[in-house]
């Protein structure tokens, strides 16, 4: 399973890259706005920081506007992936862009049939939103299971990129399901490192070593 970081914060990306555990980055207009950075410059900076796919989202909602923005964004770096909303106009744009060799990530996917349409159009990735589905009393993990099964049944090459990850249990369940990629906020990634028994074990080892050091005069 590949791990992407869902952020536009360069310091967070640098820390995660240094850990050696992330394979790409996803952004959206909200994350970019939060950083108060020029959009294209920040995307280029992210591409220079992580050597993997970097999703950058269009803001146009019409076919012509999305295709134009996508072509411009794709010119920024070979690793840029264009995030396109799950709408009829968006799927039409995905079909055009995929025929041009431009990688796409269909975002705001909340049903398996939406994911099916995205795959039919040639999307490189589909992003089902786990946490947001859970918020309306549905089962976000079941959604991913259905998408993974459908793609396997019909041999689609589209990658399932699970998004809207709220906590480490989401990551565990998605890994068990066999999802291709999980993109998560930095705070969730940090939590994956920690377990209370690990912390207690380290504390005990250090205490035992200190007692040994005192007893031997080291």
Curated annotation (Swiss-Prot):
Subcellular location: Cytoplasm
The gene coding this protein: tal
Record-annotated active site: 83
Species name: Kosmotoga olearia (strain ATCC BAA-1733 / DSM 21960 / TBF 19.5.1)
The enzyme's E.C. designation: 2.2.1.2
Pathway assigned in UniProt: Carbohydrate degradation; pentose phosphate pathway; D-glyceraldehyde 3-phosphate and beta-D-fructose 6-phosphate from D-ribose 5-phosphate and D-xylulose 5-phosphate (non-oxidative stage): step 2/3
The name this protein goes by in its record: Probable transaldolase
PANTHER family found in the cross-reference section: FRUCTOSE-6-PHOSPHATE ALDOLASE 1-RELATED, TRANSALDOLASE
UniProt cross-references to PROSITE patterns, sorted A to Z: TRANSALDOLASE_1 (PS01054), TRANSALDOLASE_2 (PS00958)
Keywords: Cytoplasm, Pentose shunt, Schiff base, Transferase
Species lineage: Bacteria, Thermotogati, Thermotogota, Thermotogae, Kosmotogales
CDD domains linked: Transaldolase_FSA
GO biological process: carbohydrate metabolic process; pentose-phosphate shunt
